[in-house]
């Protein structure tokens, strides 16, 4: 009977150790993925200074040409603002600027033109309602674009790192508890 109890303990300890090691390995893999995907986007985002933007003009453009190529037809909003004492183009997020530098706001669904147009009109009306709003500008003066919302700010980076850190901490705690339990059982068996 004593032998069965010891075997059950060892089997349970082995399973707990496997769980802890698996959690640590998953956390390390997740950290690697985040470091190769999210961290470069965070470092590339130069719009760190929060400032007040004053609306200058808004235009809705139906079709643009980019470097001699016509892009698929969808309505896009073009917003000019005055931020940090200089004229600038407002972009919704970093991704908007990368997708099409001629558009400040690209609607979510561009499949249905009428729905996309209504979405752009609604956003334009909100900008015209509120002439002064907060935006993110680059600290260096040569950047001619500002962001309405940062996707890759410090909060996004911390939120991305929360779950892998939680997983790593939990795995290490499980391993530490199993090892301390083994050590204490060896001490108790020696007495």
UniProtKB/Swiss-Prot annotation:
GO terms for cellular component: plasma membrane; synapse; voltage-gated potassium channel complex. Abundantly expressed in smooth muscle. Low levels of expression in most other tissues. Within the brain, relatively high levels found in hippocampus and corpus callosum. Keywords: Glycoprotein, Ion channel, Ion transport, Membrane, Transmembrane, Transmembrane helix, Transport. InterPro entries: K_chnl_Ca-activ_BK_bsu (IPR003930). It is a multi-pass membrane protein. The chain crosses the membrane at residues 19-39, 158-178. Glycans are attached at residues 80, 142. Its main location: membrane. Pfam families: CaKB. It is found in: Membrane. N-glycosylated. One of its GO terms (biological process) is potassium ion transport. Belongs to the KCNMB (TC 8.A.14.1) family. KCNMB1 subfamily. Regulatory subunit of the calcium activated potassium KCNMA1 (maxiK) channel. Modulates the calcium sensitivity and gating kinetics of KCNMA1, thereby contributing to KCNMA1 channel diversity. Increases the apparent Ca(2+)/voltage sensitivity of the KCNMA1 channel. It also modifies KCNMA1 channel kinetics and alters its pharmacological properties. It slows down the activation and the deactivation kinetics of the channel. Acts as a negative regulator of smooth muscle contraction by enhancing the calcium sensitivity to KCNMA1. This is Calcium-activated potassium channel subunit beta-1.
């Amino acid at each position: 009977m004593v032998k069965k109890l010891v075997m059950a303990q060892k089997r349970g300890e082995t399973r707990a150790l496997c769980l802890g090691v698996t959690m640590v390995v998953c956390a390390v893999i997740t950290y690697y993925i985040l470091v190769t995907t999210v961290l470069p986007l965070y470092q590339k985002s130069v719009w760190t200074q929060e400032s007040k933007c004053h609306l200058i003009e808004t235009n809705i453009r139906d079709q643009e040409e980019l470097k001699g190529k016509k892009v698929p037809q969808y309505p896009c909003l073009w917003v000019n603002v005055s931020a940090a004492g200089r004229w600038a183009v407002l972009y919704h997020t970093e991704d908007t600027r990368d997708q099409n530098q001629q558009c400040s706001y690209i609607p979510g669904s561009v499949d249905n033109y009428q729905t996309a147009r209504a979405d752009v009109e609604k956003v334009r009306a909100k900008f015209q309602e509120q002439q002064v709003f907060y935006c993110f500008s680059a600290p260096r003066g040569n950047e001619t674009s500002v962001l309405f919302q940062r996707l890759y700010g410090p909060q996004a980076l911390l939120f991305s790192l929360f779950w892998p850190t939680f997983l790593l901490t939990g795995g290490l705690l499980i391993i530490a508890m199993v090892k301390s339990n083994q050590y204490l059982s060896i001490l108790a068996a020696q007495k």
